Swiss-Prot record:
Protein source organism: Lactiplantibacillus plantarum (strain ATCC BAA-793 / NCIMB 8826 / WCFS1) (Lactobacillus plantarum)
Enzyme class: hydrolase
Family membership: Belongs to the acylphosphatase family.
Keyword Hydrolase among UniProt keywords: yes
Protein name per Swiss-Prot or TrEMBL: Acylphosphatase
Entry-linked InterPro entries: Acylphosphatase (IPR020456), Acylphosphatase-like_dom (IPR001792), Acylphosphatase-like_dom_sf (IPR036046)
Swiss-Prot/TrEMBL keywords: Hydrolase
PANTHER family documented for this protein: ACYLPHOSPHATASE
Protein's UniProt keywords contain RNA-binding: no
Active-site residues from the entry: 18, 36
Catalytic activity: an acyl phosphate + H2O = a carboxylate + phosphate + H(+)
Length: 90
């Protein structure tokens, strides 16, 4: 089990980024949350099998929506929170 937090900056709010991230998470088979932050970035917690999480990170890095553009993606390893699905929390 691998768990990460991601912080995506760039054109990531107002472009369907959270919805596309949820779709990508469901396709990759990872659980967690995604939410907008007040600074204009997007925060993601994701967990699942190592390979699935890595594929998800790669999708987010390339932007899960054609309307968005990730300029920078911070990735941090964290302890799993045992999410049961993937949700948009705001």
């Amino acid at each position: 089990m691998r768990a990460v937090t991601l912080k995506a900056t760039g054109r990531v709010q107002g472009v369907g980024f959270r919805w596309a991230t949820k779709v990508a998470a469901d396709k990759c088979g990872v659980n967690g949350i995604v939410r907008n932050l007040m600074d204009g970035s997007v925060f993601i917690e994701a967990e699942g099998e190592d390979q699935r999480v890595q594929v998800f990170i790669d999708v987010v890095r390339q932007s899960p929506t054609d309307f968005g553009k990730v300029k920078h993606l911070e990735v941090h390893e964290v302890e799993p929170q045992n999410y049961h699905d993937f949700r948009i929390t705001n």
